From Swiss-Prot:
It catalyses: L-glutamyl-tRNA(Gln) + L-glutamine + ATP + H2O = L-glutaminyl-tRNA(Gln) + L-glutamate + ADP + phosphate + H(+). Keywords: ATP-binding, Ligase, Mitochondrion, Nucleotide-binding, Protein biosynthesis. The keyword tRNA processing does not apply. Its EC number is 6.3.5.-. It comes from Saccharomyces cerevisiae (strain RM11-1a) (Baker's yeast). This protein may be expected to contain an N-terminal transit peptide but none has been predicted. Subunit of the heterotrimeric GatFAB amidotransferase (AdT) complex, composed of A, B and F subunits. SUPFAM superfamilies: GatB/YqeY motif, Glutamine synthetase/guanido kinase. InterPro entries: Asn/Gln-tRNA_amidoTrfase_suB/E (IPR017959), Asn/Gln-tRNA_Trfase_suB/E_cat (IPR006075), Asn/Gln_amidotransferase (IPR018027), Asn/Gln_tRNA_amidoTrase-B-like (IPR003789), GatB (IPR004413), GatB_Yqey_C_2 (IPR023168), Gln-tRNA_amidoTrfase_suB_CS (IPR017958), Gln_synth/guanido_kin_cat_dom (IPR014746). It comes from the Eukaryota. One of its GO terms (cellular component) is mitochondrion. This is Glutamyl-tRNA(Gln) amidotransferase subunit B, mitochondrial.
Length: 541
């Protein structure tokens, strides 16, 4: 890779400070990443074939054109959507998009590369520079702030897949070219990582960025994102690690390779560390694949069939003006007034894991923000910022997941203004939290039972009256006394009561309050139960 060896020889070594990692300050790690990301374009990079590289259901070689299988006489036609996606990622990373870039042929022979070469950008990459900033506040690293520099981004085409089948006499290789010519972006970082936490945080942040920009699924498990690691210790030669299918493999491979090299250095056996080499990860150890002596000469040359990519500055500026707000900025906004979300809740509204079919982070964030604004109008200055957070992110989402109702459908009966009215009932203590949970679940359950066809907006007043969910403002003292005594009578264990009264197990009081709330169907407030239980049991703490 261009400039990579020079950066590894010049980068300043740093001491390792990683909790739980087997790193020692006297053996300083320098680490960089090469990340290949498949782009979610409609078509492939140089043909009109459908881009379905990560599909697990398509028949082999179903999405291929004459060009994808390298039929003689076919020529590449550049997919401009891939250029747009590359521009969006480059701008999000703060990279310098080159006004002129070009494609080069990287020559090698392998069964899943029918052309005999791969089209990449060796001499004039698409973009250079840029960075991703990590912080203790948002990314759980040990340093207060850490900048990971980007060397370059380049566009290239993916290869096909080889499948191996063993027979009694031989090993048969089957080639699937559905993935051949799928557009990739290769991102190369500087060797700025000095511990495991930084690597893990970077991968997670980069995954979320490409999902946030809608340019890739970012999934390691499907091969939509593939990561190679470059590392060295104490200025010895760089080792490249390959075959890393997921984040845990990446982390474990770095740990193993670090320990392997430390053991060699500590006993003075450093001859094998003097020259760069490539090693593969088996799942439990790294094994040598090739050394400098066996490195392939790719014989790079400019592709004569493709013109330069020439981007005018007004095109770059136009795309910059269409860029969405970036995840870190969104999270910091959500964690400040008026929203005041916790980091965990802010990430739920910002990070897209691709693992939840009920909602995506953008739709959920939009619903939350719209509801928050509507609730603030209704409640005025007395509005409680935590109420929309708790009820949307925790209760509402929990019900949607339990009932398997997509957010897009639930919004039809509970649009933000209606959900804000529901929050107002809780805010003004017309209903208790327990009654609110029952009411919300009842509304969604009925909607589910209608196969999401009954789009009637719920009438909260009628439902509250029907199910007698009104909070009791004037509690009958005798009724409350009887309820509390009944709850206490269910616990004949003297140790339970004694530990509660002495304060040895204060949490037991919350348990009793919960029992009372259930018996009253949430109509009697928790603080009423707390006062009465303390009175009956003579609790002094």
């Amino acid at each position: 890779m261009l400039q990579l060896a020079r950066f590894y020889s010049l980068a300043r070594t740093k001491a390792i400070h990683s909790h739980g990692a087997p790193f020692r300050p006297e053996y300083a790690l320098k680490c960089g990443l090469e990340i290949h990301t498949q782009l979610n374009t409609k078509n492939k990079l140089f043909s009109q074939s459908t881009n379905s590289a990560t599909s697990l259901v398509d028949a082999p070689n179903h999405h291929t054109s004459y060009y994808d299988i390298a039929l003689p006489g076919t020529q590449p036609v550049l997919n401009l959507e891939a250029i747009l996606f590359a521009m969006k990622l480059s701008l999000a990373l703060g990279s310098q998009v080159n006004s002129i870039s070009q494609f080069d042929r990287k020559h090698y022979f392998y069964g899943d590369q029918p052309q005999g070469y791969q089209l990449t950008q060796h001499y004039r990459p698409f973009a250079r520079g840029g960075k991703i900033n990590l912080s203790k506040e948002l990314d759980d690293i040990d340093e207060s702030a850490k900048e990971i520099g980007i060397l370059q981004l380049q566009i290239e085409q993916d290869t096909g897949k080889s499948h191996y089948t063993e027979t009694d006499k031989d090993v048969i290789t089957l080639v699937d070219l559905n993935r051949s010519n799928v557009p990739l972006i290769e991102l190369v970082t500087k060797p700025d990582f000095s511990d495991i936490k930084q690597v893990r945080a970077f991968i997670k942040k980069y995954q979320n960025l490409v999902r946030h920009l809608h340019i890739s699924s970012g999934d390691l498990e499907t091969g939509a994102m593939r990561v190679d690691v470059n590392l060295s210790i104490n200025e010895y030669a760089r080792v490249e690690l390959k075959n890393l299918p997921n984040t845990s493999s990446i982390i474990n491979a770095i740990k193993y390779e670090y320990q392997r090299q430390v053991e060699l250095i500590s006993v003075g056996d450093t001859s094998s560390l003097m020259e760069p080499e490539t090693r593969g990860w088996t799942g439990s150890s790294t094994v040598k694949l090739r050394s400098k002596e066996t490195t392939i000469d790719y014989r790079y040359m400019p592709d004569p069939e493709l013109p330069y990519i020439n981007l005018a500055q007004d095109v770059i500026s136009g795309v910059r003006g269409l860029m969405p707000q970036l995840p870190d900025d969104i999270m910091r906004m959500l964690m400040k007034k008026p929203y005041q979300l916790s980091l965990k809740d802010a990430k739920i509204l910002t990070y897209n894991s691709n693992q939840n079919d009920m909602y995506n982070h953008e739709a959920l964030r939009s619903y939350y923000l719209d509801t928050f604004r509507e609730f603030s109008k209704l409640a005025g200055e007395r509005s409680n910022a935590k109420l929309p957070t708790n009820w949307i992110i925790h209760e509402f989402l929990g019900d949607l997941n339990k009932l398997q109702i997509p957010l897009a459908r639930a919004k039809e009966i509970l649009p933000p203004p209606v959900f804000a009215q529901f929050l107002k009932l809780l805010h003004e203590e017309v209903i208790s939290a327990t009654s609110g949970k029952m009411l919300l679940f009842h509304i969604l359950e009925n909607f589910k039972q209608s196969n999401c066809q009954d789009l009637s907006i719920p009438d909260f007043s009628k439902l509250i009256e029907k199910f007698e969910l009104h909070a009791i403002n004037q509690v009958d003292p005798q009724e409350l006394m009887d309820l509390c005594n009944d709850v206490i009578a269910q616990h004949t264990d003297d140790t339970f009561i004694r530990n509660l009264v002495t304060g040895k197990k204060k949490s037991s009081l919350k348990f009793l309050i919960g029992q009372g709330m259930r018996r009253s169907q949430g109509r009697i407030k928790a603080n009423e139960f707390e006062k009465k239980f303390k009175e009956i049991l003579n609790i002094q703490w």
